[in-house]
Amino acid sequence: MPHFPQTQTKTRSPRVRVPNSESIRFNLGGRQVSAVLQKISLTGGLAEFTASIGSATIAEAKLNTISGQVNGLVEFLPSPDGTAYPFRFIALSDDDYERLSSTIKVMQQQGFGA
């Protein structure tokens, strides 16, 4: 059953800083674009692109983690500078959600909490 992360809760989802310039890939209307993942949480993240992605609002995201590949549907939020784009997950499978959750827990234990 798909998981739809809820962002309207009173408790903010824990964020972690992503070290080592980890890559995340987005499918923007058939165009594959890579970015550097800066922060990640169970509800979204922040990706740094080399150039503006234009008016794209919805994309498929693929991220390799220590727990396995995470695939999800994301919505981009307005960029403060034209290259760093916050995004929120709008759909994740149960397995992808569990892999992401496990990865974030390990990163928190390693001291990468944001």
Q: Would you name each region that the model predicts?
A:
Residues 1-42, 101, 105-114:
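N-terminal helix initiation/capping motif
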Residues 13, 48-54:
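Short, surface-exposed secondary-structure edge patches
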Residues 21-27, 56-69:
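Short conserved beta-strand and strand-loop elements enriched in small hydrophobics
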Residues 29, 42, 52-54, 79-82:
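Short strand-connecting beta-turns/loops that link adjacent beta-strands
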Residues 35, 71-77:
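Short beta-strand-centered aromatic/proline hotspots
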Residues 40, 77-79, 92:
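Residue-level recognition of beta-strand microenvironments
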Residues 45-49, 81-91:
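Short, solvent-exposed secondary-structure boundary/capping segments
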Residues 58-67, 97-109:
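Extended Gly/Ser/Thr-rich low-complexity repeat segments
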